[in-house]
Amino acid sequence: HVIEVLDELGIRPVAISGASIGSIMGVAMASGMSGKEIRDYALNLAGNRTDVLRRMIQARSGSIRTLFSSENSFAQLDAVNILKTFLPEQMKGSFDELLIPTSISTTDYYGAKERVFESGDLLAAMAASASIPFVFQPIKYDDRYLVDGGIFNPVPYDHLHDKADIIIGVD
């Protein structure tokens, strides 16, 4: 909704920073998608349960049996595969392609500190930032295990202080 209001007001950010689902929304906006396009894509996808189930099975490593087995209660989903399967085609594939500079906040699980991406593997950064522990597998990156950026910094506006005069935070 916030992105749609910004669109209506003709406000285009000069920089974006996000954590967890906010990193995915931020990358969608930085890729040039409007708030309406993002909402329409999500509603269309959510409204088609058969397609969602098909995509979940497609994204799942292993068989359909392992997807629903009780022994799999702690086996987590692969966030990279989920994103590859569900992200709209309009979303860019690298930080260099983004129309707006973007920072993605993740949490270094064992280091108990924030890891911020502004370059490198965009898909891995989004996947790590949205990897809720025990739901999604941590993302191994540079020999570190990265999880949901919202754990350490849920609204990473502090990465925008030197990039923008006005900062809008959404929680």
Give residue ranges: language-model regions:
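Patatin-like phospholipase
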Residues: 1-19, 27-171
